[in-house]
Amino acid sequence: MGEPIVEWLNQQQGNMVELLRDLVNIDSNSFDKAGVDRVGTRLTAFFDNHEIPHETIPLEEYGDAIRAVVSGGDGNQPILLCGHRDTVFPTGEVEKRPFSAADGKAFGPGVADMKPGLVVNAFILAAFHKFGGHPNPLVGLFTGDEEIGSPASQDVITAEAEKARLAFNSEPSRPSGNIVTRRKG
């Protein structure tokens, strides 16, 4: 089962870069609900295109949460794929330094943070939706306020995590390969 998925994912590299470009070129500071929700709209369009069921969980002050589900084996606890759509960059940053790519590297607001992880999670969901074969359901949870401590989405995250067999957060490592294990302060 793994080989067709890997082959398909390898064929999707251009589409992955296109989705990353689209996400990076949307200003999405944590306090810019409209911008964070525009990133969500782009992701839900991706899910619609791949016929992946999803729902938007409205949150008043910060970006809404998005939950996408790919069915798996009956009765098994889901695998949770987490990611956040917000960045620390002020609104207007995209105009100063939009997405670019050179020599196999991408640049722009959110590229060294979570936006590539959103692409990874979206394509994992799409691959397993297309090919099936995962023994557990997959749940993608895409929140909008992580950079400020998840004040609005914490309850949503906790509820999904409590149901899950395990959870993955696809936030990248530092350029050194070190990983972040906690927030500052």
Where are the language model's segments positioned?
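Phosphate-binding glycine-rich loops and adjacent basic patches that engage nucleotide phosphates
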Residues: 1-11, 81-90, 115-120, 168-181
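Acidic/His- and Gly-rich active-site-bordering loop/insert found
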Residues: 2-109, 129-130
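Short, hinge-like loop/turn segments at secondary-structure boundaries
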Residues: 74-75, 98-99, 157-159, 184-185
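Acidic/histidine-rich catalytic neighborhood of metal-dependent amide-processing enzymes
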Residues: 114-184
